[in-house]
């Protein structure tokens, strides 16, 4: 044997040992070995179960073995020539296998263990996702419950505030009493809980609108009574001045009021201290005080009718002009001689006219159809009334009270007709001088400064 052949035998054996070591390491891996065993078992079982398939597989095995043997025989010279390169590749493959075994520990485990571990990981992941979904569902349920409770609290508090600031009317109390008489009717709180949020909110808005409308009309009627009370006292004061100007000894008014108090003070004074100038001055001071009080009432009426029809605003403007004319007539007077007779007659007519205008003002407001405050999905039961309630004025009178009976003796319609006839004909029963002075006062009557009107739905709701 030559030296070259002797040298090649050891190198060939070393390469085969290294190659065998690499192959053995790969095959010896538990995962690979278990997988190959499982595949072989399935393959053998398939061949035994199907004879035709088994014959074909055995034939294919023989062919593959023959082809592999021949290929190795022909490739042997090439493999011997590439032995150094193959050895290097084998070494690199071994290093890569070592690193792979470190990074993938499951390669050292059988396939059953790997499959079981994978199942456990998947099951734990699915369980985590399911738990997260359950927590999210539980959180959404709690959030819904919290929102529902918050809405209930807000609605209940709103209903309590409405009941406190806008008490129930007689109609609502009668309806509740009729419902309470039924054998199977629950309480008001139970009925409210059974209703939906939108229905409760719509009912609340309709109730607020109805109660606030009645409340606002009641306040307007109260202002009307206050204004008419002041006008009645002012009318008696003007009559007192007229009687004293004509030289007629006036009698004490039978009705209580500021004029009655003034006469009571005069009656309690001793005769020597009753000076006519002092009485005249106090009467004029009383007239100016009543006029200023009337101006404040008119300002309240003006703020209440902003945004209402032009007819209501015009009535208040007429009252304002009458009050301003009275204020101008009595502004500089220190005694009865400073008040012209024509101005006094004109003032009495203006007071009567203002009284009638205040009466007509409330009638216009009561007859006006109120606009709905809330429309859309949050007001499912709001329906605009085609006409106002027929007994609304009577219901308001029950709360506010009717006209003051102290001034029932004043014939306001007759005084109003006399004032209108005097202005229509241009001449009255008095002398021409009185009418001339009255005409001058009318011409010099200051105009009410115009101010921008703020239009609102229900401006009288300033409570």
UniProtKB/Swiss-Prot annotation:
<keyword id="KW-0597">Phosphoprotein</keyword>
<dbReference type="GO" id="GO:0005737">
    <property type="term" value="C:cytoplasm"/>
</dbReference>
<dbReference type="GO" id="GO:0032000">
    <property type="term" value="P:positive regulation of fatty acid beta-oxidation"/>
</dbReference>
<dbReference type="GO" id="GO:0051646">
    <property type="term" value="P:mitochondrion localization"/>
</dbReference>
<feature type="region of interest" description="Interaction with LIPE">
    <location>
        <begin position="1"/>
        <end position="108"/>
    </location>
</feature>
<feature type="region of interest" description="Essential for lipid droplet targeting">
    <location>
        <begin position="1"/>
        <end position="173"/>
    </location>
</feature>
<keyword id="KW-0963">Cytoplasm</keyword>
<dbReference type="GO" id="GO:0031999">
    <property type="term" value="P:negative regulation of fatty acid beta-oxidation"/>
</dbReference>
<dbReference type="GO" id="GO:0005739">
    <property type="term" value="C:mitochondrion"/>
</dbReference>
<dbReference type="GO" id="GO:0005811">
    <property type="term" value="C:lipid droplet"/>
</dbReference>
<dbReference type="GO" id="GO:0010884">
    <property type="term" value="P:positive regulation of lipid storage"/>
</dbReference>
<feature type="modified residue" description="Phosphoserine">
    <location>
        <position position="2"/>
    </location>
</feature>
<dbReference type="GO" id="GO:0060193">
    <property type="term" value="P:positive regulation of lipase activity"/>
</dbReference>
<dbReference type="GO" id="GO:0010867">
    <property type="term" value="P:positive regulation of triglyceride biosynthetic process"/>
</dbReference>
<dbReference type="GO" id="GO:0043231">
    <property type="term" value="C:intracellular membrane-bounded organelle"/>
</dbReference>
<dbReference type="GO" id="GO:0019915">
    <property type="term" value="P:lipid storage"/>
</dbReference>
<dbReference type="GO" id="GO:0010897">
    <property type="term" value="P:negative regulation of triglyceride catabolic process"/>
</dbReference>
<dbReference type="GO" id="GO:0010890">
    <property type="term" value="P:positive regulation of triglyceride storage"/>
</dbReference>
<feature type="region of interest" description="Interaction with PNPLA2 and ABHD5">
    <location>
        <begin position="185"/>
        <end position="463"/>
    </location>
</feature>
<feature type="region of interest" description="Recruits mitochondria at the lipid droplet surface">
    <location>
        <begin position="444"/>
        <end position="463"/>
    </location>
</feature>
<dbReference type="InterPro" id="IPR004279">
    <property type="entry name" value="Perilipin"/>
</dbReference>
<keyword id="KW-0551">Lipid droplet</keyword>
<protein>
    <recommendedName>
        <fullName>Perilipin-5</fullName>
    </recommendedName>
</protein>
<dbReference type="GO" id="GO:0042802">
    <property type="term" value="F:identical protein binding"/>
</dbReference>
<dbReference type="GO" id="GO:0060192">
    <property type="term" value="P:negative regulation of lipase activity"/>
</dbReference>
<feature type="modified residue" description="Phosphoserine">
    <location>
        <position position="148"/>
    </location>
</feature>
<dbReference type="Pfam" id="PF03036">
    <property type="entry name" value="Perilipin"/>
</dbReference>
<comment type="subunit">
    <text>Homooligomer. Interacts with PNPLA2; prevents interaction of PNPLA2 with ABHD5. Interacts with ABHD5; targets ABHD5 to lipid droplets and promotes interaction of ABHD5 with PNPLA2. Interacts with LIPE.</text>
</comment>
<feature type="modified residue" description="Phosphoserine">
    <location>
        <position position="322"/>
    </location>
</feature>
<comment type="function">
    <text>Lipid droplet-associated protein that maintains the balance between lipogenesis and lipolysis and also regulates fatty acid oxidation in oxidative tissues. Recruits mitochondria to the surface of lipid droplets and is involved in lipid droplet homeostasis by regulating both the storage of fatty acids in the form of triglycerides and the release of fatty acids for mitochondrial fatty acid oxidation. In lipid droplet triacylglycerol hydrolysis, plays a role as a scaffolding protein for three major key lipolytic players: ABHD5, PNPLA2 and LIPE.</text>
</comment>
<dbReference type="GO" id="GO:0035473">
    <property type="term" value="F:lipase binding"/>
</dbReference>
<dbReference type="GO" id="GO:0005829">
    <property type="term" value="C:cytosol"/>
</dbReference>
<comment type="similarity">
    <text>Belongs to the perilipin family.</text>
</comment>
<dbReference type="GO" id="GO:0034389">
    <property type="term" value="P:lipid droplet organization"/>
</dbReference>
<dbReference type="GO" id="GO:0035359">
    <property type="term" value="P:negative regulation of peroxisome proliferator activated receptor signaling pathway"/>
</dbReference>
<keyword id="KW-0496">Mitochondrion</keyword>
<dbReference type="GO" id="GO:2000378">
    <property type="term" value="P:negative regulation of reactive oxygen species metabolic process"/>
</dbReference>
């Amino acid at each position: 044997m030559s030296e070259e052949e002797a040298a090649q035998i050891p190198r060939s054996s070393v390469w085969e040992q290294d190659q065998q070591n690499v192959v053995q390491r790969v095959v010896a891996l538990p995962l690979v070995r278990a997988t190959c065993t499982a595949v072989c078992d399935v393959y053998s079982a398939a061949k035994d179960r199907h004879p035709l398939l088994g014959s074909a597989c055995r034939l294919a095995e023989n062919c593959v073995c023959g082809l592999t043997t021949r290929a190795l025989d022909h490739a042997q010279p090439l493999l011997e020539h590439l032995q150094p390169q193959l050895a290097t590749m084998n070494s690199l493959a071994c290093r890569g296998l070592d690193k792979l075994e470190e990074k993938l520990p499951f390669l050292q485990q059988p396939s059953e263990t790997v499959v079981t571990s994978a199942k456990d990981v998947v099951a734990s992941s699915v369980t985590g996702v399911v738990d997260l979904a359950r927590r999210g569902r539980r959180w959404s349920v709690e959030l819904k419950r919290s929102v529902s409770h918050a809405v209930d609290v807000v609605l209940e508090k709103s209903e309590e505030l409405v009941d406190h600031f806008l008490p129930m009317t007689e109609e609502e109390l009668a309806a509740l009493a009729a419902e309470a008489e039924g054998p199977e009717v629950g309480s008001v709180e139970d009925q409210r809980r059974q209703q939906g949020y939108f229905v409760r909110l719509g009912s609340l808005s309709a109730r607020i609108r109805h109660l606030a409308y009645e409340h606002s009309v009641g306040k307007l009627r109260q202002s009307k009574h206050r204004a008419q009370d002041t006008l009645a006292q002012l009318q008696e004061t003007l009559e007192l001045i007229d009687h004293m100007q004509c030289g007629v000894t006036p009698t004490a008014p039978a009705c209580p009021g500021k004029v009655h108090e003034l006469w009571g003070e005069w009656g309690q004074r001793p005769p020597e201290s009753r000076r006519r100038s002092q009485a005249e001055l106090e009467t004029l001071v009383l007239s100016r005080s009543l006029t200023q009080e009337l101006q404040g009432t008119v300002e309240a009426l003006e703020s209440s009718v902003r945004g209402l029809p032009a007819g209501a605003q015009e009535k208040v403007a007429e009252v304002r002009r009458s009050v301003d004319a009275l204020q101008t007539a009595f502004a500089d007077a220190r005694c009865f001689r400073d008040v012209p007779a024509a101005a006094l007659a004109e003032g009495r007519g203006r007071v009567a006219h203002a009284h009638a205008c205040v009466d007509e003002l409330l009638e216009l407001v009561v007859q006006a159809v109120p606009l709905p405050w809330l429309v859309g999905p949050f007001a499912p039961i709001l329906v605009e009334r085609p006409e106002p309630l027929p007994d609304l004025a009577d219901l308001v009178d029950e709360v506010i009270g009717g006209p003051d009976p102290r001034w029932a003796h004043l014939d306001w319609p007759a005084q109003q007709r006399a004032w209108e006839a005097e202005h229509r004909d241009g001449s009255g029963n008095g002398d021409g001088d009185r009418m001339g002075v009255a005409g001058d006062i009318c011409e010099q009557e200051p105009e009410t400064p115009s101010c921008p009107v703020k239009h609102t739905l229900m401006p009288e709701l300033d409570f």
